[in-house]
């Protein structure tokens, strides 16, 4: 149940389909939010948990609307929870980070914050002035990890990083808890047979690394498990723990942070 708050963003990633040049800004009104929430709740089982994905563009740019959506949904149904997909830039603001951390409603209802980060040194993820965002993103990840937020790093494999996605995830897994790294594949950007071959080769490298216990990165068939509408969604997925154990989980929207991995938020400077 995805709520798109805006197509605006504080980054200008070259591969993004939302914030295209000449495309007018689009922002949900309060009425739009109520209509969207009501539409979801009308078709949901009143006795089951309802999950909303807070999305954009960049949803934190419309935080008042995000907050309104969460409170409105909660006023209609107590058994609701949320996850948010964000580039995380706004969490560099200590004031905003504190605002989220100090609110017990957010802490209980915001199950996960998925921070998109598609490459170490990726020049396709830039600010509007052309400046690279990677230095900021490393600070974002350290800030949310230190603050104790429930977060995951969402890496989308696409044409811009297909040549180095394996190296990226390996490096990130050595700095941050690898159980927090999830991956998805933007298949529409990987049209060339060579790109598909590189994807397959990267998967094989990870499997071999696991056999040799050379790295510490979980493998989830390399697909994101967040969106129920995803064409690659499967009922069960296999996760490899940092001890070499294999566990199969049911795949459902907004799956929680993988609980069987060691929590080791060792942030290397």
Where are these regions (language model features)?
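Active-site neighborhood of divalent metal-dependent phosphoester/pyrophosphate hydrolases
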Residues: 56-58
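Cysteine/selenocysteine-centered motifs that mediate thiol-based redox chemistry or coordinate metal-sulfur cofactors
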Residues: 269
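Short, contiguous acidic/charged loop-to-helix segments that flank catalytic cores in large enzymes
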Residues: 23, 264-266
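Radical SAM enzyme [4Fe-4S]-AdoMet core and its adjacent flexible, acidic
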Residues: 125-245, 249, 256, 261-262
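Short acidic/His/Gly/Ser-rich catalytic and metal-binding motifs that mark active-site loops
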Residues: 11-15, 121-124, 192-193
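Canonical Radical SAM [4Fe-4S] cluster-binding loop centered on the CxxxCxxC motif
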Residues: 1-35
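Radical SAM/AdoMet-radical enzyme domain recognition
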Residues: 34-53, 62-188
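Residue-level structural signal for beta-strand termini and adjacent loop
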Residues: 65, 251-254
């Amino acid at each position: 149940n995805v709520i798109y708050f805006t197509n605006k963003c504080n980054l200008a990633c070259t591969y993004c389909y939302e914030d295209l040049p000449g495309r007018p800004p689009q922002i949900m009104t309060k009425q739009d939010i109520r209509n969207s929430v009501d539409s979801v709740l009308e078709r949901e089982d009143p006795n089951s948990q309802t999950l909303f994905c807070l999305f954009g563009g960049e949803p934190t740019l419309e935080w008042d609307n995000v907050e309104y959506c969460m409170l409105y949904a909660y006023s209609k149904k107590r058994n609701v929870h949320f996850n948010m997909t964000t580039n995380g830039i706004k969490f560099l603001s200590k004031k905003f980070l504190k605002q989220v951390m100090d609110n017990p409603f957010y802490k209980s209802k915001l199950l996960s914050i998925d921070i998109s980060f598609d490459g170490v040194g990726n020049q396709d993820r830039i600010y509007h002035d052309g400046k690279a965002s990677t230095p900021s993103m490393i600070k974002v990840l350290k800030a949310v990890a230190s603050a104790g937020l429930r977060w995951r790093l969402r890496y989308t494999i696409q044409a811009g990083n297909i040549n180095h996605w394996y190296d990226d995830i390996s490096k990130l897994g050595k700095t941050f808890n690898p159980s927090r790294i999830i991956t998805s594949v933007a298949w529409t950007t990987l049209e060339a047979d060579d790109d598909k071959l590189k994807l397959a080769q990267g998967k094989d490298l990870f499997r071999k690394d696991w056999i040799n216990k050379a790295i510490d990165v979980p493998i989830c068939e390399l697909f994101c498990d967040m969106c129920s509408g995803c064409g690659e969604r499967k009922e069960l997925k296999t996760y490899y723990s940092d001890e070499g154990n294999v566990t199969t989980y049911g795949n459902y929207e907004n799956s929680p942070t993988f609980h069987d991995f060691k929590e080791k938020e060792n942030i290397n400077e």
